[in-house]
Amino acid sequence: VWITGSYDHELGLSYWGTGNGGPWMGDTRPGDNLYATSVIALDVQTGELANHHQYHWNDSWDWDEVAAPLLIDYARNGQNIKGLIHAGRNGYLWFLERSEESIDFVDAKPYVYQDVFTNIDEETGRPEYDMSKKPGTGFEASFCPSLWGGKDWPPVAFDPTSRLLFIPANDNVCSTMVGEEVQYNPGQAFMGRGQSENGGFFI
């Protein structure tokens, strides 16, 4: 993590966004890579992990999700929800529900053009991928949004009066990237990213 988390004093939980794995190419680290590209909740009294939600699994796009979600309560289907809202680098706006026991998926909608996710599970929020859009070691792929994400580090803002969310978005920018083999050397970059380019285009 490298952006300060959010704090819910009623629940005694602090919410933090987490980065992507290294090297960048997911084929070098099989599995979901649990807790990467996620929001985690920490008990502020003990420092222990209380719960989590992973926005996307086995990242290969440098879509880290280090921005902490906003603690915004909202209504869905006539129900008031103690919410977490996150504008992801993966180009989706995530609506979650926070409680002492869990972080539950509610909804997710793209806020910029996104061509990697083919479906999001309605119960869990787990996305499915178009694997032709997922770069790997020696495998070039083009994808949207770019490696800069639908939103990079600048924070979002929320107006509680108008109920509007303001997102410093990177729209209409895509990337082409290929991974390369990399050896771990302490103190040096450990990305395994080969040639990449960004373009203001839709693939």
Regions found by a protein language model. Name each.
Residues 147-150, 196:
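A short catalytic or substrate-binding loop motif that flags glycine-/basic-rich loops and adjacent residues
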Residues 1-24, 28, 38, 63-88, ...:
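Repeat-blade elements of multi-bladed beta-propeller folds
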Residues 25-65, 72-80, 92-143, 173-203:
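Extracytoplasmic/lumenal domain signature
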Residues 16, 124, 148-149:
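Short glycine-rich loop/turn motifs that provide flexible caps or phosphate-binding loops at active sites
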